[in-house]
Amino acid sequence: LTKPQLNILPAEDPVEYELEGVGQVQIKDDIGLSFAAALRSFLRQDPEIILVGEMRDKETVDIGLKAALTGHLVFSTLHTNDAPSTITRLQNMGTPDYLISAACQLVVAQRLARRNCKDCKVPDDDVNPKVLQDLGFTAEVASRVKAIKGKGCPKCKDTGYKGRQGIYCLLYTSDAADE
């Protein structure tokens, strides 16, 4: 996304990583530079891509979704428990359904799960195939699942875990969802 010909405008609180070739804006509510104020300013600068650190209030949501409707690619974050809850959260903030369905193309929810320690992982034979079937796996696939667990070692401080792994849920919108 970082091509010189693209006008990318991010509003962040705080700016966590410096992006080469991108003019980042640090939100400062104490001087009136809110996410909503930054978005209003961005729309006068002919951006191709707008990054909004967080949709915290109705005004920011409305401006962000309207920017998406006028041809801008808008990325943002919103605190919810899962991807489908994003729609409910936007509705609870007072956003009309037509605006949500017209402007939202993709919702990504992220969870960070603990990763088994590579240095002490061992097979876990305690996985019940019935539990896997209840989760939607076919009996054939469930019987072939090989699970692992960390037994604990000095490298993971005897926890069996070291690091985190992203798990993502994607919610695509469609014409059927619009109806």
How does the language model describe each region?
Residues 1-174:
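Short, flexible helix-loop junctions that flank or precede catalytic/ligand sites
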Residues 175-179:
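A short, hydrophobic C-terminal helix/tail in secreted or cell-surface proteins
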